[in-house]
């Protein structure tokens, strides 16, 4: 069964340790610009959202790659870049709807989350467990529960509004 990163942004404290661990584990340097996961900050709201490749089923990055350097590893459930084939054209960067691909100016190649070959270091080092690596089916169940909860709240609000309108 394939696994996926699951981000619970409500747990994220914005410490950015995931970014540092990622860059060190991939490139041997502590540089958030080289991280495959980025923490987006909305400080006024106190909201921090770790973002990384969503490993899309119909990955736009894969579809636009002119040399087929991006493919899907079905066993691991990830989309990955073959760096020996990548020509650094950056078409995939523009195609990614999540902004999850970056470009290494030195190597002239794109880079993205590769799930650390099955042991994501961001998960291992996230002390608040805002980032987890769980079965795809479990992610689906969590998303369904979340959507049902939002619909329930919206339904209750709509019922209350309707009751006030018909007084």
Regions found by a protein language model. Give the residues of each.
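Mid-length scaffold segments of soluble, non-membrane domains
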Residues: 74-75, 99
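Membrane-helix exit/interface motif
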Residues: 69-71
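Flanking helices and flexible, charged tails adjoining ferredoxin-like Fe-S electron-transfer domains
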Residues: 2, 34-35, 40-67, 83-167
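A positional/architectural concept
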Residues: 16-24, 28-30, 35-42
């Amino acid at each position: 069964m394939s696994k996926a990163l699951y981000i619970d942004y409500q747990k994220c404290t914005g410490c950015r340790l995931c970014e540092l661990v990622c860059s060190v584990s991939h490139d041997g340097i502590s540089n958030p610009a080289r991280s495959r996961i980025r923490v987006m900050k909305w400080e006024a709201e106190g909201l921090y959202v770790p973002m990384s490749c969503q490993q899309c089923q119909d990955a736009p990055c894969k579809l636009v790659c002119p040399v087929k350097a991006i493919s899907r590893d079905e066993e691991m459930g990830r989309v990955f870049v073959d760096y020996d084939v990548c020509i650094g054209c950056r078409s995939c960067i523009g195609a990614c709807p999540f902004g999850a691909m970056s470009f290494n100016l030195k190597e002239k190649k794109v880079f993205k989350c590769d799930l650390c070959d099955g042991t994501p270091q961001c998960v291992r080092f996230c002390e608040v467990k805002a980032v987890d690596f769980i079965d795809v089916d479990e992610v689906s169940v969590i998303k369904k529960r979340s959507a049902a909860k939002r619909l329930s709240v919206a339904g209750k609000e709509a019922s209350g509004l309707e009751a006030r309108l018909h007084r």
